[in-house]
């Protein structure tokens, strides 16, 4: 969490999906009122079984992640990236890196990438279970219309 006098820090997991773009937009909407910075994290790694790429080079995987991050930021915010948004390319498994990134964050925001209306994706599920800060799971716009909000109270 934040030390006294520090600005809140929001970490957003970005994979280029509609849900991650919605997560970026949500972070942008929260950042202003909170005076927060937003770190847009695109995590990448060499897939298992691609040992040859370690010899030939892994730049293609990093480049693809960078392109996906740039496109997601453009989709979320338009041509001009807000000054409070800071893109980050992070090598490693997304769930592990985002959980580690949550150590010094005020909030971690991820998209829901599940199969079906009740199942979280593996990254969002791991983050909810193991993050070191509060986690907000954001649905893609087409999923949000099918979600029933609950307060957690017995009456509602």
Q: What residues fall within each predicted segment?
A:
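Structural beta-alpha unit
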Residues: 1-6, 19, 26, 77-108, ...
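A short acidic, glycine-rich active-site loop
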Residues: 57-68
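Active-site phosphate/pyrophosphate- and oxyanion-stabilizing loops and adjacent acidic/basic residues
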Residues: 74, 96, 125
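Short glycine-/small-residue-rich Rossmann-like dinucleotide-binding loops
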Residues: 15, 73, 113
């Amino acid at each position: 969490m934040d030390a006294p006098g520090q600005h809140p820090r929001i970490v957003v997991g970005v994979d280029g999906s509609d849900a991650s773009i919605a997560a970026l937009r949500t972070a942008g909407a929260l950042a202003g009122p909170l005076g927060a910075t937003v770190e847009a994290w695109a995590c990448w790694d060499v897939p298992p079984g691609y040992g040859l790429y370690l010899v030939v080079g892994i730049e293609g995987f990093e480049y693809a992640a960078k392109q996906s991050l740039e496109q997601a930021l453009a989709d979320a915010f338009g041509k001009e990236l807000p000054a409070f948004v800071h893109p980050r390319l992070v090598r490693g498994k997304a769930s592990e890196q985002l959980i580690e990134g949550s150590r010094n964050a005020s909030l971690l925001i991820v998209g829901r990438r599940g199969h079906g209306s009740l199942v979280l994706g593996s990254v969002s599920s791991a983050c909810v279970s193991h993050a070191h800060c509060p986690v907000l799971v954001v649905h893609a716009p087409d999923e949000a219309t099918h979600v029933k909000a609950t307060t957690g109270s017995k009456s509602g």
